């Protein structure tokens, strides 16, 4: 909701402590951090660790290789897509693709749409979407739902609960942080 503060659980505090983000106890079981500090210091830490952050792009497709394993993504500039210009996209190869696209699980849905017979590691083999909001339960199952759901494709964050039909989470971000950590470990 673009608020100036975000809430995390104590379990995720160590991730912020590691990169110097200040957290203040709000009430038992919850900490509050400055949203701008969290985003800017997290981005800087990721860049310092070797990540590349591309802004203003859309994922149009996935790259596949033997056995229809996901081996990268096909991207284009968001402005190109919005203007409906005919500009060739660019393929980016990757050992593993992490779908952290949120509630829509866009990469997973693209795999299901474009690869005949593809099935996700989910209750029905598809992307059923999240159940209605139950923030505490959604946070509780999020790390468990963070996993490889198709060869070469890992889900994290809200996309993980969308694929696993977990409850929608509320405006608490600790589970999202721990889900991202888990995805990186996979």
Segments from the language model and where they lie:
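Residues forming the flavin
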Residues: 1-186
